[in-house]
């Protein structure tokens, strides 16, 4: 199980809010990277999704692990995508996708790919 994931979005606050709603958790600011938010699932593992402003790159930086670097222009689309299991009905997921993201149903035969 993956308990931590980082993605970029044009509107990190909105994206984190939608993810938090779907996960039954809450979205909070992520101070290490200004303008970022953390969608917390509020489970026993501390699972969540960090949402950075589009154009943010995380570069290796020795002992601290990494440094956030904002590129001068947003790249538009990226290759990051993931499947997230939530205890939310399909209609609510569909409504959330209408707020700017995308969603599609997944079947058991599709899982793990």
Regions found by a protein language model. Give the residues of each.
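Vicinal oxygen chelate
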Residues: 2-9, 41, 62-91
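Core segments of cupin and vicinal oxygen chelate
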Residues: 7-57, 95-102, 107-112
């Amino acid at each position: 199980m993956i308990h931590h994931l980082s993605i970029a979005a044009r509107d990190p606050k909105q994206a984190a809010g939608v993810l938090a709603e779907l996960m039954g958790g809450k979205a909070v600011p992520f101070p290490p990277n200004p303008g970022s938010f953390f969608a917390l699932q509020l489970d026993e593992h501390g699972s969540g999704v960090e949402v950075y402003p589009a154009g943010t790159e995380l570069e290796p930086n020795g002992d601290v692990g990494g440094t956030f670097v904002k590129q001068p222009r947003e790249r538009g689309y990226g290759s990051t995508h993931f499947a997230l299991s939530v205890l939310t009905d399909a209609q609510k997921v569909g409504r959330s996708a209408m707020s700017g993201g995308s969603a599609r149903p997944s079947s058991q035969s599709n899982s793990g790919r």
